[in-house]
From Swiss-Prot:
Stretches with biased composition (Basic and acidic residues): 1100-1109
Disulfide bonds: none
Function: CRISPR (clustered regularly interspaced short palindromic repeat) is an adaptive immune system that provides protection against mobile genetic elements (viruses, transposable elements and conjugative plasmids). CRISPR clusters contain spacers, sequences complementary to antecedent mobile elements, and target invading nucleic acids. CRISPR clusters are transcribed and processed into CRISPR RNA (crRNA). In type II CRISPR systems correct processing of pre-crRNA requires a trans-encoded small RNA (tracrRNA), endogenous ribonuclease 3 (rnc) and this protein.
Positions that bind Mg(2+) 2: 10, 767, 990
Cofactor note: Endonuclease activity on target dsDNA requires Mg(2+).
Protein name: CRISPR-associated endonuclease Cas9 2
Binding site for Mg(2+) 1: 10, 763, 767
UniProt entry tagged with the keyword Metal-binding: yes
Species this protein is from: Streptococcus thermophilus (strain ATCC BAA-491 / LMD-9)
Keywords, ordered alphabetically: Antiviral defense, DNA-binding, Endonuclease, Hydrolase, Magnesium, Manganese, Metal-binding, Nuclease, RNA-binding
InterPro entries documented for this protein: Cas9, Cas9-BH, Cas9_PI, Cas9_REC, Cas9_RuvC, HNH_CAS9, HNH_nuc, RNaseH_sf
């Protein structure tokens, strides 16, 4: 039997570190068998390693391509339906017509008939184009003419309408004469007033319509409309909406008090994403006003289209397009004449050079209208007499094309209007048109409802439609074949996600009245107030909360702090009220209540709890469906409750978004003792006033236990762990890490002879710790300072600049001391004394909440002071004496937004008794105990995998402890014992973290077994009394000293030093827990192992990479046909289209590589030659290869194939000199070219690791020790440099770069310490690795070393892997290996 052991895991988004430890903290090693054809049969390996992999990605790219394919397929089908109707009649006139149209884009040699697509002869073709320069000329002619037209022309006009049929946003009847701008503007105003609680109105809306239709610039339109509303400012939010509506860009940053720019532009392709981002900051409540503004913008745009002088025409759109064509023609002639007079050179650049943004590039589609206007404006501004052109450019009405972005505002009804005119006129001459009129119209108007979804049959992952009968679906039989009601139900089930806490329950809509009520009470429950004669802040009681909801939340959409103050004063007579837990206004609201009240107009009905189910069902329907017909159908069941007018108004309402919680969680599950639901507690929780998170984690209530029980995996799911992980909340990246970690644990158990581990310790990386928003915020420091100091009335930013700086910018403000200096207006935060800006390094940065309790290094927890001792006690917040003196100043900083409410609260906490023992215990405990839901899910998966037996009470019998640990504990352990981590050196740090997790967790639980309820997943009733037994003060002492068991001595704040025993023991059992010499020596020894199992996960590629972003089978954009004799390899746009004639797609993405042993014919004499070589298999070719591998390779020119070995991306090769390479890809179009990565890991001794740790942090001005250490050990850089150079010589092979580096290093003594550090390890705060770019695993990269540019090493070739190379297949841990000596292949 194997000895007892534990497993440590460090799970990230692109790595999993792992380690096996024994009871004495050692990492065992095992002699592992090696399979394959090499002489190596066994290798001794340490049970310590890391699995690296490419991060999981979202399905967005795949989804976008899939929807585009469907759109094009359906468009093609519409054309085929029309051809089917025309086919019999057309055959009697011209039986090759459709064939010629299909061949129209083919080169002349490939056409099956005449090269003239419409009439088949030059004379008629020319006459057609002379009479009808654009398709719109033809459409207008046919719509207005009473003459019999050629059937081919009728088809062309109808096909154009069916192909580009317009949007379906407007329901019901619509024509060009009822495009009501005034009504749309009133709708926008109503919504704006409701959301922003204003009362804007416009008496003369006709005036507004005249302004938007006038031929003036967009800016002038906005200004004129704004003047119709005298109370509105040019800088206000209404003005920004007007900018949007007239077609300009708006910025809502100031309006919503955001840190970053929030630009929106209706005509931008990214508008939907930009709006989604903005709503993410400000809330979905505002989505309606943007929706109404967009509708108004579309109406204005459409009115601009349809402004024609010919009132008799039945083709208003075509008339507008003809007008645009004529204006373009006339303006082009004027522009050509004008520019010709400037110079011939300018004329040629504008009209002949398509590489510029001039007319040649614009008309050829290589530059867009916006860039063309910018180019032209700049050119024309230099010359006189260009006012006509410049005015039209300002109106965006110059040289417009027929097809532009604003065509998207045309509804399908406009095309239908013209279609009906043509059919009515021509049906007199072609009876089949009269007979099929409804069918033809149906082709244009038919749209598959989104709730029916894709119509695929069989095992499609993306289709859910339910059929009544099994036959081909057409626009005319859709209603008979598809069961719309059942499909809608399937859509609901598919659309609604599951509760994070109760995985079997569906979440509520975001606008559910229950969900909104929950959010309101959850926010209210943490509001506190203080008034005159009150000693401390107190929470609102149950009656007060109910009153506020009834009187304010149900009376207005946005409730503010003033409302609460007004209530407390009016009802309770309080004066001098101050609030906490709310900034100006509540985030939550009962917006749905107000919507329904406006529609139903029955407050009693809404307030009656017995109607809750009806209201929730209505909101659910309005969230799920957009289709008015389906909404009406589903609301029809309430006809006996509401009258028709109410149901009609309801059917027009639409909600978006889903909450995160279910009705059952909020108001379903009940506490076993009290019988209360979570909502009940939020409304009335006595004096506790716990919020949602506190309620579900409170051991005194049964919610926590019920949630845990609900999360247990069913037996039917346990077999398919991949599906279970897939269903977890979280990103694809973190899920991939979880899945790999479970595979690693399975393999380690196998390696350990099948014996289960004593414990598994899990630490999980936080995702996106450095988000774009975070980066942006750090870069916005200057802007925020300028704004806040201006508010304070301070000129310090301009007047006080450090002597060593010429100006203050965002870079300079990354220095926390300088930033704090300005945030504090140059004052000591505790004394108010002036600080000297040129002596900032002499001052202390003090942590408001001491680091002993909270490791918070954010600006919110830091102040700059002349001496930290001025705060008062070192184990508490600043003293009451300091608060009394400085509170007024701090309040000024708060009002100017130089400090946050949280910072102010912590600074003034002494007024409320300072840090209580409960506060301190809570701070410390939160840093020790992992609370993230995703980590709990992983712990649950492992717990149910290994502890699946039950006792007689149906409780899990836990033989394997699943321990979750926060990274702060290991970070503290590393810091205390100088076990430095430097990520740039190699990938070992993931394995080391996993090992240290296991060590720290094991030692702590041996010493303090009563900590199991804190760290071990599951139910531990025997220790539950531990929490109640210890007082808060005892907890503080216990938690803050928890890591002291590893230290020999502890230094106290008062200067005393307490010695601890050399060997820590468990006080109850006497068992030895931690020997501070031998056990620490063991840890140092393990971290110094040069042999760590590093595996890069090999994977078949399902997508390529395009500038670092996932792409499809090849580059998305078509490339033009290659020049004659070009070697460029393209994939045809269609299988039957030769890319040499028609162009195609470049950048073919590879899936994997095969190693082929066989023969090929070489040279002109076709000499048979034996080969062993790589052949890339593209994602495109993969299906054909899998169908018949041998035949596929024979077609590639191979003969007598003896052997095929498939090699996924990152397959590992070891050369005879010990250097390792990973095969990233071989081009499928040229097997002599490919990408080979470095595969060795450099190992450094601890003295070099320590040097580099300090070197990476040399710019840290708070801790000068980093610089001092590097200055004292500068000589070690020389030794390190030559060690790295030797590694390069032996394993990397970049010998030319080695010489370049050697030459650059000769002058190293002349370089500053900062240059040396950034050259060796990369600049502080950067992801660049400096000199370690040369040695690190993966693709080569260029870098700079001591001022010399070192180019990317590109000399690895595919053939280099075939000389004396051994192919190494590794298992997920790297412990199992199969080695194949390529030289011995074929020896049987």
């Amino acid at each position: 039997m194997t000895k007892p052991y534990s497993i440590g895991l460090d799970i990230g988004t692109n790595s999993v570190g792992w380690a096996v430890t024994t009871d004495n903290y050692k990492v065992p090693s095992k002699k592992m068998k090696v399979l394959g054809n090499t002489s190596k049969k066994y290798i001794k390996k340490n049970l310590l390693g890391v699995l690296l992999f490419d991060s999981g990605i979202t399905a967005e790219g795949r989804r976008l391509k899939r929807t585009a394919r469907r759109r094009y397929t359906r468009r093609r089908n519409r054309i085929l339906y029309l051809q089917e109707i025309f086919s019999t009649e057309m055959a009697t006139l011209d039986d090759a017509f459709f064939q010629r149209l299909d061949d129209s884009f083919l080169v002349p040699d490939d056409k099956r008939d005449s090269k003239y697509p419409i009439f088949g002869n030059l004379v008629e073709e020319k006459a057609y184009h002379d009479e009808f320069p654009t398709i719109y000329h033809l459409r207008k002619y046919l719509a207005d003419s009473t003459k019999k037209a050629d059937l081919r022309l009728v088809y062309l006009a109808l096909a154009h309408m069916i192909k580009y049929r317009g949007h379906f946003l407007i329901e019901g009847e619509f024509n060009s004469k009822n495009n009501d701008i005034q009504k749309n503007f009133q709708d926008f105003l109503d919504t704006y007033n409701a959301i922003f609680e204003s009362d804007l109105s416009l008496e003369n809306s006709k005036q507004l319509e005249e302004i938007v239709k006038d031929k003036i610039s967009k800016l002038e339109k906005k200004d004129r409309i704004l003047k119709l509303f005298p109370g509105e400012k040019n800088s206000g939010i209404f003005s920004e909406f007007l900018k949007l509506i007239v077609g300009n860009q708006a910025d809502f940053r100031k309006c919503f008090n955001l840190d970053e720019k929030a630009s929106l532009h209706f005509s931008k392709e990214s508008y939907d994403e930009d709006l989604e981002t903005l709503l993410g900051y400000i809330g979905d409540d505002y989505s309606d006003v943007f929706l109404k503004a967009k509708k108004l913008y579309d109406a204005i745009l459409l009115s601009g289209f349809l402004t024609v002088t010919d009132n008799e025409t039945e083709a208003p759109l075509s008339s507008a397009m003809i007008k645009r064509y004529n204006e373009h023609k006339e303006d082009l002639a004027l522009l050509k004449e004008y520019i010709r007079n400037i110079s011939l050179k300018t004329y040629n650049e504008v009209f002949k050079d398509d590489t510029k943004n001039g007319y040649a590039g614009y008309i050829d589609g290589k530059t867009n209208q916006e860039d063309f206007y910018v180019y032209l404006k700049k050119l024309l501004a230099e010359f006189e007499g260009a006012d006509y052109f410049l005015e039209k450019i300002d109106r965006e009405d110059f040289l417009r094309k027929q097809r532009t972005f604003d065509n998207g505002s045309i509804p399908y009804q406009i095309h239908l209007q013209e279609m009906r005119a043509i059919l009515d006129k021509q049906a007199k001459f072609y009876p089949f048109l009269a007979k099929n009129k409804e069918r033809i119209e149906k082709i244009l108007t038919f749209r598959i409802p989104y709730y029916v979804g894709p119509l695929a049959r069989g095992n499609s992952d993306f289709a859910w439609s339910i059929r009544k009968r099994n036959e081909k679906i057409t626009p005319w039989n859709f209603e008979d074949v598809i069961d719309k009601e059942s499909s809608a139900e399937a859509f609901i089930n598919r659309m609604t996600s599951f509760d994070l806490y109760l995985p079997e329950e569906k979440v509520l809509p975001k606008h559910s009245l229950l969900y909104e009520t929950f959010n309101v009470y959850n926010e209210l429950t943490k509001v506190r107030f203080i008034a005159e004669s009150m000693r401390d802040y107190q929470f609102l009681d149950s009656k007060q909360k109910k009153d506020i909801v009834r009187l304010y939340f149900k009376d207005k959409r946005k409730v503010t702090d003033k409302d609460i103050i007004e209530y407390l004063h009016a009802i309770y007579g309080y004066d001098g009220i101050e609030l906490k837990g709310i900034e100006k206004q509540f985030n939550s609201s009962l917006s749905t209540y107000h919507d329904l009240l406006n529609i139903i107009n029955d407050k009693e009905f809404l307030d009656d709890s017995s109607n809750e189910a009806i209201i929730e069902e209505i909101i659910h329907t309005l969230t799920i469906f957009e289709d008015r017909e389906m909404i009406k159908q589903r609301l029809s069941k309430f006809e006996n409750i509401f009258d028709k007018s109410v149901l009609k108004k309801l059917s027009r309402r639409h909600y978006t978004g889903w909450g995160k919680l279910s009705a059952k969680l909020i108001n379903g599950i009940r506490d076993e003792k009290s019988g209360n639901t979570i909502l009940d507690y939020l409304i009335d929780d006595g004096i506790s006033n716990r919020n949602f998170m506190q309620l579900i984690h409170d051991d005194a209530l049964s919610f926590k236990k019920k949630i845990q029980k609900a999360q247990i995996i069913g037996d039917e799911d346990k077999g398919n762990i991949k599906e279970v992980v897939k269903s977890l909340p979280g990103s694809p990246a973190i899920k991939k890490g979880i899945l790999q970690s479970i595979k690693i644990v399975d393999e380690l158990v196998k390696v350990m002879g099948g014996r289960k581990p004593e414990s598994i310790v899990v630490e999980m990386a936080r995702e996106n710790q450095y988000t774009n928003q975070g980066k942006s915020n750090s870069q916005q420091r200057l802007k925020r300072l300028e704004k806040s100091l201006k508010e304070l009335g301070s000129k310090i930013l301009k007047e006080n600049i450090p002597a060593k700086l010429s100006k203050i910018d965002n870079n300079a403000l990354q220095n926390d001391r300088l930033y704090l200096y300005y945030l504090q207006n140059g004052k000591d935060m505790y004394t108010g004394d002036d600080l000297d800006i040129d002596r900032l390094s002499n001052y202390d940065i003090d942590h408001i909440i001491p680091q002993a309790f909270l490791k918070d290094n954010s600006i919110d927890n830091k102040v700059l002071v002349s001496s930290a001792s001025n705060r008062g006690k070192s184990d508490d917040v600043p003293s009451l004496e300091v608060v009394k003196k400085r509170k007024t100043f701090w309040y000024q900083l708060l009002k100017s937004k130089l400090i946050s409410q949280r910072k102010f609260d912590n600074l003034t906490k002494a007024e409320r008794g300072g840090l209580s023992p409960e506060d301190k215990a809570g701070f410390i405990q939160r840093q020790l105990v992992e609370t993230r839901q995703i980590t709990k899910h992983v712990a649950r998966l492992l717990d149910e995998k290994f502890n699946n037996k039950k006792d007689e009470n149906n409780r899990a019998v836990r033989t394997v402890k699943i321990i979750t640990l926060k990274s702060t504990l290991v970070s503290q352990f590393r810091k205390d014992f100088e076990l430095y981590k430097v990520r740039e050196i190699n990938d070992f740090h993931h394995a080391h973290d996993a090992y240290l997790n296991a060590v720290v967790a094991s030692a702590l639980l041996k010493k303090y077994p009563k900590l199991e309820p804190e760290f071990v997943y599951g139910d531990y009733p025997k220790y539950n009394s531990f929490r109640e037994r210890k007082s808060a003060t005892e907890k503080v002492y216990f938690y803050s000293n928890i890591m002291n068991i590893f230290k020999k001595s502890i230094s106290l704040a008062d200067g005393r030093v307490i010695e601890r025993p050399l060997i820590e023991v468990n006080e109850e059992t006497g068992e030895s827990v931690w020997n501070k010499e031998s056990d620490l020596a063991t840890v140092r020894r393990v971290l110094s192992y040069p042999q760590v199992n590093v595996v890069k996960k090999v994977e078949e590629q399902n997508h390529g990479l395009d500038r670092g972003k996932p792409k499809g089978l090849f580059n998305a954009n078509l490339s033009s046909k290659p020049k004659p004799n070009s070697n460029e390899n393209l994939v045809g746009a269609k299988e039957y289209l030769d890319p040499k004639k028609y162009g195609g797609y470049a950048g073919i993405s590879n899936s994997f590589t095969v190693l082929v042993k066989g023969t090929i014919e070489k040279g002109a004499k076709k000499k048979i030659t034996n080969v062993l070589e790589f052949q890339g298999i593209s994602i495109l070719d993969r299906i054909n290869y899998r169908k018949d591998k041998l035949n596929f390779l024979l077609e590639k020119g191979y003969k007598d194939i003896e052997l095929i070995i498939e090699l996924p991306k990152y397959s590992l090769f070891e050369l005879s000199d010990g250097s390792r390479r990973m095969l990233a890809s071989i081009l499928s179009t040229n097997n002599k070219r490919g990408e080979i990565h470095k595969g060795n890991q450099i190992f450094l001794s601890q003295k070099f690791v320590k040097l580099l740790y300090h070197a990476k942090r040399i710019s840290n001005t708070i801790n000068e020790n980093h610089r001092k250490y590097v200055e004292n050990h500068k000589k070690e850089f020389e030794e390190l440099f030559y060690y790295i150079l030797e590694f390069n010589e032996n394993y990397v092979g970049a010998k030319k770069n080695g010489k370049l580096l050697n030459s650059a290093f000769q002058s190293w003594q002349n370089h500053s310490i900062d240059e040396l550090c950034s050259s060796f390890i990369g600049p502080t705060g950067s992801e660049r690795k400096g000199l370690f770019e040369l040695t690190s695993r993966g693709s080569a990269a260029d870098f700079e070393f001591l001022g010399v540019k070192i180019p990317r090493y590109r000399d690895y070739t595919p053939s280099s892997l075939l000389k004396d190379a051994t192919l190494i297949h590794q298992s997920v841990t790297g412990l199992y290996e199969t080695r194949i000596d390529l030289a011995k292949l074929g020896e049987g």
